[in-house]
Every structure is written in structure tokens, then in C-alpha cells.
Amino acid sequence: MICGLILSRLVGPGCEKGGRAFFPCDPYASPFPSIKGLQLHNAQLFVQNFQNPNTPYSRLLLNWQTGTGKSIAAIAIARQFMNHYMNFIENAPWIFVVGFTRTIIQTEMLRRPELGFVSYKEVAELHRLLHIAKQSGSTTSVESRHLNGFISTLKRRLTDRNRGGFFQFYGYKEFASKLFNITSKGEEKNFDVLSLFHRSDEAEDTLNENDISQFVQKISEAETNGLIRVNQKIMEQLRGGLLIADEIHNVYNIQERNNYGIALQYVLDAFPPHQAPRAVFMSATPVTGSVMEYVDLLNLLVPRHELPNGQPLQRQQLFDNSGHSVKWKKDALALVERLSIGRVSFLLDTNTNFYPERIFAGKMLSYRDEKLPYLHFIECPMSNYQLETLKQLGPDPKISSNAYSIYDMVFPNPKFSKQTEPKAYGLFNSTETPAALSMASTDWLLENGVQIIEPSRRTPFNVSGSFLSLQPPTHISGLAFYSGKYTQMMKDILSIIREGRGKILIYHNRVRMSGVLILQEILQSNGILNEVSSPVGTTRCSICAAIRDDHTHSDHQFIPVRFTILHSEIEPAVRERSLALFNASSNLEGHQLRILIGSKVIVEGLNFQAVRYEMIMSLPLDIPRLIQVFGRVVRKNSHMELPPNERNVTIYLYVSTTPDGGPELAKYAQKLKEYILIQEGDKALRKHAIDGFTNQIKIDKPMLESLPLSPSITPANVGATVLNTFEAYGYGEQEVKTISNIIISLFMARPVWTYSELWKAVSTPKLIQGITIDNKLFSEDNFALALISLCYSKNQCKELLIQNRLCTIMHVPAKPEHLYIAAVLNHKKEPVLDIETYIRDFQPPTMHSVRITKYLEHSQTKEPFQVLYEKFQKDFQDEPIEQVLIHYPASFHYTMLEALIIDNLAGMGALVEVYKKFFIAFSKKDIQPFPDIFKIISHVPGDDNTLVGYATEDSVRLITSRKDKTWHEIPLYMLNINVKRKENDIVIGYMESKGKALKFKIRPPIQVLKKNEITDIRMLNRGAVCETRGREEQQKIANQLGISLNLTKISAIKLCLLIRNNLLQKEMEARNQPNGMQDGIRWFYLFNDKMPSLVHTS
């Protein structure tokens, strides 16, 4: 009876694929699911089996397109070597992972239990800790520390030999510096490893191959002379080991002088061939900056003894560089083909089942009557003001590296009172523009809608203001005046938002001047918010792009458009949080974060999910890197959460043009010519790809990623397959694991199987999605082994998670054939088998977490505002009203300020005067000297003395509607408030929360702390409660402050009160001096002042 009920629920679609074994079928049931967990695809399986300890192949280049799983393939290869090294009794070699993206590889290893470095339970615990740490909202919380500790423990397992680790992870720079240690003698002589080599062309800064063949000998000579010390520990670890180098094109790129490639070349060539480490190199674009990099690539890829005459290749062997351009020599490409045989894996996967469709907006352009291949552009004619500025560079301008902004925009020029004057031109040079704008008068800045963003340690000089707006005030020239390109970008963004949902990635290679920082200001000037700002009347809706004041749509709620930004000057932890939020499934449509602006830090190693639009504002050095930028958003399975009709990415490639083409278009034309030469080398490199016969890549016409290509395949009679090494080399174990995953997936489809039915289903090709190998070749012996390993026995319960149920597979003897039933487990982890087995949905008790630290903080320090308000009214009937600033926490003051502004509390005139005296609260009269800002609050009812805003530690909040309780935030500097006023030379006072109390603390001024050399971080004076200071120190401070009482008869508590009140009085006086909030001396930090960070930097 039980079996009859269960068998009646067999899966519908897909039944017939397996033959009669799958009848009867329920026509309404779901199809068989995809196999769960990580499954290596064919290309990954092939290279894993090709490059392993049991094959003779020493070096391999994974030339796979971006997003196809190079890192997983490299880890799979490394796992085979690790399994082999574990059999060594002593002196086992190491696996070195070197590259700028090594943390990405570590992350993959720790989030994929199928790779064998972590268990499923550890991954579940990692996800749990990640969730809790994210809820804490702080990278320094207890929860975040627990997460970091857990991750560190897992990482140590990879690198600690005592814990079974076989890996070493290095950045390229770190690896080179640790391999080549400059001695003190070498430092005295300013020795540089690169000095061992001459330069063939100083302008290109590339190595001379006439000397490169002797570099091992030269390094040995330098070591003998005491200039350098080669790290023998690293050399011994690499002897017979494995070297994985990610993004290999970075080690020999001519754009930047480095010794990364020399370090790799040295460790590969310093050993006899049979002791040299194996090597796996990875890159979607192995040659980038110059076609001549092929020489460096082949010298790394081909062992020395297999190169012509046993010597490194030289550039003159492959290239003719006699004229104005580089050309391939005759037979050079044939040599590349021959040398790359057996050493290159090529993968270009365009399967639309897994990858989003790539769509180019715009049109193809020509430069000087030559059509530019491959790329479509959004043509952006320069504005007249840009053209006038370009004329300053002459008739055929050569754009220097500090003049790159001319490609994008120009800035207002203080040389001209009005930018619309005849012959007026703008600024664009990165060395001149910041100085010129910084020295401009306040009147000129206001007249031209420019606001200076003062630089800080992590924020370089930048500008904002209405000159970046599409709709500026009538007397100000707006964005269209200064940039045709950015005007078009802004119009396209608004059009995309109006047309529907979809996330946008904006790329610019630069950070400063016309780079990502100004893009951030352009978005904000046109109604798009950053991650944290509150909406105001001009904020745009993420659904219809209307501004909030005009938002009349009844079919949807107003949701502000928001953006985030990633660049090298943002803390890594902040970048990771922003990226996680942008990629989150909850942000699929972009209503939490619609736009991400990224600099060149996003070109390699980062993945973006479900991006529908990519806007490229500048060329990233060369075309191969442009391909890398495309690959950030076109990745395998990157759009699987979107509906099928939305699995595409539209790419906007913006270029500024002039009537005769322009310098930016000329740059693209030159780089595309260079890229054609690189493509010819790529074609030769890939012709004999080791997996060409399995991937069956055939490219009929030129495309961005490849010239026409047909793999060179020579049919051969290989005879019968030799199976006697199948088990010995571990392939049988891999097959058992694969079959186990298939069996679990089948039990997700139906809970009861007979042995023959199950074997039939397992061996049926394409029955379950995600299996790329030929099921018909499975061994039934391995199937039986997999089934037994999953089945319940009384001695050991095999727990499985099937359809969200904690299950086991029960083996039930029956006639005529035994049954295998997926039975749920009860709380004792015993299988339950009855008539409801197939529908019972048992789940273990859900765990709930409480943030203890947050609870304690709230319960100990927060009192209801009403309680504090009543206490305030009672305490300050007779006390000096200024004392309110130091007796109540920031939460009370901010609530009070908003109540004063919104509700106009009666009887609070004295408190309002205190807030105004310390420049904490602002009336309409206070804002009137700033016309651009006054426009924001001019419509707010009330006379000149009406409060309209208050200062926080980061900004000034201005009321825009008392009824709706909406605010507009502006930077502090816009009201001439300098957050970094110079501290006095005596002592600094401030209040700090201790439980429900506020304690008065003092510390030395920051300039004194900087002068003192502190060798022990524990000795860094971060401040202390005044009463805990020594009596002598208290009296010294009081004397320096001019407190003229008889201090010997005053208690420590009274003395500290005198010091506190004195500092508060001096702070008020300093603020009320002319320009006091800009240049006044700092004595006391109030509740809304940001304290400088005190960290030990030595």
C-alpha cells in the first residue's frame, strides 16, 4: 500500500527520457532537478586530468574567456597534486598560488565543499557567521571578529603543514621581494634586481633578451658578491612542486616596470628539468600592452631546454621593429604554433543557457576613413567649450598622461569671470586644475556653481556643484557646457530607469579629475543618492526617474535611485560590503543599489551579478583589458536569477569626438591596430589547443575575442581504452562521488526507487541538468558502491538534505525487487517510514540569534527622550545653560534639535541660543550669506530667526518640509565649517559615554602625539577620564589654562570640573571669532564633532 501511494507520484516531464523504468508518470509533477553543488564542466575536468602528477606535462596556459571558471580549474588541478603530495613521508613539495587575485582563489576554496578543503557543516557555519556579522553593521563588532577568526582558522588549514596544508599564497610583488632579498651591502649600493638587465628601448622600459639568457648566472654572481640573497627556503618548497600564476599578463606588461616576471622565470629555470616546479598560468588575455609580450609569455610557458637552441627567445626572432610599427616576421607565427603545442587550453564559451547575451549599443565608427573593427560606440560630440579648450593644445595634440581629462570633460577656469566669454577655455590638466580652483574666490565659485570638496587622507581633491547638473540655475552653465560625453551618459541613465528595471555598472579607468570621483558628483547633482543619504525634493525615483517633488505616480511608491562606488582609495572592507549589497539577490532589480561606479580595481577578480547595462567611459589602457571589463558582467550563470528575456547586458562605449575625429577616437584606432597583431599571435597560440578536439571551437569570422579559428585535429587510431590505471589514478573515486550526487538528485524527484530503476536513471544521459559527462560510461560497480555509501545502516546514520528535509536512504527488502526509500529523520536522527513518508516535511528546530552586545548597549545607554527631556527641564532651571552640551548624549541633542526645528518647541529660547552660539543650529538668517544653499530652505515658513538646520559630524541637515519631515544634507564645508581645525597645544577635552553616564576625558593634542615616537602601541595615549589623571598632571593643566585658584585645596573632582568648564568656554570663544569655524583653535569636541582617529602607524 505504501509503495503504491508513493509510486503514483513519480515525476512527469523527463520520465520518458529514461524509458519504461519511469512509468507511471504524474503529468503535473516537476521535471527532474539540476544536480546540486559544484560540478566541474568538461573543460575543467579535461585540464584536471591533463595536468596532474601522473602526466608528463610540465606547464599549461589556461587561456579561457572571463567568467568560465579558470580559478576552479586551477584549484581542481592543485587538489590532484595535493593528494599526491600527501603520500610523501617527508619533504613534500608545496603548491604556490601567486597573483593579485589570490584572495579570490582562497574564497573559492573555502566556499565550495565539493573541492575538499572545507566540509558542508563548515560552509553552513561560515554563512551563519556572515549573516550575523552583516546584521551587526560594523567591521569591528564582536560578531565580525568571530567571523574573521573562523575564516582565519579555515585559511590556516590551507597553509599550515601541521594541519594538512600544502598551499602558499603570494601577491606578485610580495613573491618577488621575498625571493630576492637585498642585503645591507646591496642597499648601500642601491642595488636593483632589474639593474642586472639592459633595456632594449628605455621608452618602452622592456627587458633586453640578449642578456636575459644569462640572468640566472647574473643573480648567482650578485649573490656571491653579497648584493642579494635568494630565499632558499622558497626554492626548496618549490622543488618538484606546483606554481599557479593568475592573470599572468601582469608579470611582463610593458606599462609598468617590475621584477615579477623575473622572479617567476628564475624559479622555473633555476632547477634541472626533472626538479622544476610544474606551472599553471591563467589569463583570458595573455598578451595586453604590446604584441612583443609574446616573447616573455613563451619564455615562461616553454621550458628552457625545449626552446630553439636551448636559449630564451629574443624579440628579433619574432618581430620586425625597424620601421614606425612592429610586425610579425616571416615564419614567426609558425614558431609560436609549434612551441605552444601541448601547452595551451583555450575556451570560448558562448552557450546562452549559461551566459547572458552581450549587446552593443551605438554604431561602428571610422577614423580618417578607416573603419574601426569590432566595437560599437556612443558618439559624443565635444561641446564648443571643450573644443575651444582642445585648441589650446595645437592642431595635432598629443595628450599627456596628466591631461587625460580632456577626453571626458573640462572644468571651469577662474581665469575667466564668465565661462561664456569669447575665447574662454577650461581646465583639464591634473597638476594645474586643483590649484587653480582651490585659489578661486568665493564669489567666482558661487557665480559658476562650483563647490570645492576639501581633500583628506583618503579623499583627494574634487569638486561638485550645479555646474554638473543637467538643469542648472539659469545664470550657471551646466553639464552640457563642460562635457558632451557625461551629458549623454546622464541622459542614458535616466532613460534606462524610465524604461524599466536593471542594474547599471559605470566604469572609468581613473579615480581623480574626470574619473570615478567626478562621476559620483555628477550623479548626486542630478538627483541620484549615494548609499546612505536621505531623499530630498530633487531625488529621483528608481522606478520612473521623476524627482520626488514631482512624483505623482499612483501605481508605485517612491523609491530613491542609489549608487555605490568602488576604487582603490576606499577601505577593502567597505568595498566588499558595497559589492555584496549590489550583488545581493534582494537587489536583483536594483531598487536598493541601482548603479555601481568602478575604477580599474574592478577589471580583474571581481564578479558582478545580474547587471543589465555597462557604461564604459574610458579605454582601460588597451583592448585586451577592455575585454576584461566586458567580462566583469558577462559571466557564467551571472544572470540565472533573472527571467530568460532579461538575461542580457547592453554595453555603452562612450567616446568624445570632434569634427575630424578627435584624440580619443584616435587612441581607440591605434589600440585596435595593435590588437589585430595580438590577435594574430593569439590565433597561433590556440591553433593546437590541447582541448580543441573536445571543445570543438570553430570561429568562422573575426570577432573581438578571436580571429577565425579552426582547431588543428589529426585523427588517430588510439585503440581500445586502457582501464588498468582508472582506479589507481583516482578516477574511480571521482566517478563514485558524481554518481552519489546524481542519486541524491533523483531522490529529490521521487522518494522511492528500485535498484534497476535507479541504475537506469543514473546511466541515462541528460536526464539531470548539470552533468556534462557521458553517463553511459558509468560502471555499475561504482553505482553500487555509491548507493551503499548513501544507505542507512543501524551502525551509522547517513544524513542527507533532500528537498529541505533531513533524510536518509532506507534499503527495504521487498519482492520482486528491493526498494530504496528516502525517509525523513526524527529528532533522534532515526528514519521514519510510514504511509506519510513521501509528504512528511521534517525540519530540525530553527536556531535564532540575538546580538547580545547590541542589546546591552541599548539597554545600558539609551533612555527615552521624554525622560531625558523632563530631566533637562528640571536640572537647568538654575544651571548655566551651556552645560547641557556636556550632560546629555548625542541622541538627545539630535532629537531635541529636530523637535525645535519641526515642532518649534516653546520656552526653549535659551537652549536655541546655545546651539547657535556653538554653530550647531542654524536659522534662515545664518544661511542667507550662502545663496545656493538658501534656495533649499527659502520656501520653509518662518522669519529670519526660524531654525532650519543643524550640524552633525558629517553634514548639515536642512529641513525642506516640516509636514513630511524631509531633510536635505550638504557637506559641512559649504557653511564654512572645517572639521579639522587645529588643536591647541595644551590639552583636548571631550565627553565619552560610559553606561548611562557621560565621562569627561582629556588627551594631549594630536600634534603632540604625532611628535612623540611611540614604539609600543600600548603606550599610545588615546585619552583618559580626567579624575584618573595624577594630581600633578591635573594641576599643571589647570595652570596652563590660566585657572588662578588655590589648586592645592580643591578636590580632584572639582578641579576636573574647572578644567572642563574652562575648555568649553574657550571652545565657544574660538568658534565666535571671525572665521572661527574655519580657522579657530580647537579646545573641546562636542557631541556632533568627529574626533580624529588615533592609530599607531609605525
Curated annotation (Swiss-Prot):
Motif (DEAH box): 246-249
Binding positions for ATP per the UniProt entry: W64, Q65, T66, G67, T68, G69, K70, S71
PROSITE patterns: HELICASE_ATP_BIND_1, HELICASE_CTER
Subcellular location, record wording: Virion
Listed EC numbers: 3.6.4.13
GO MF, one example: RNA helicase activity
Family stated for the protein in its record: Belongs to the DEAD box helicase family. DEAH subfamily.
Function: Putative initation factor.
Annotated protein name in UniProt: Early transcription factor large subunit homolog
Taxonomy of the source species: Viruses, Varidnaviria, Bamfordvirae, Nucleocytoviricota, Pokkesviricetes
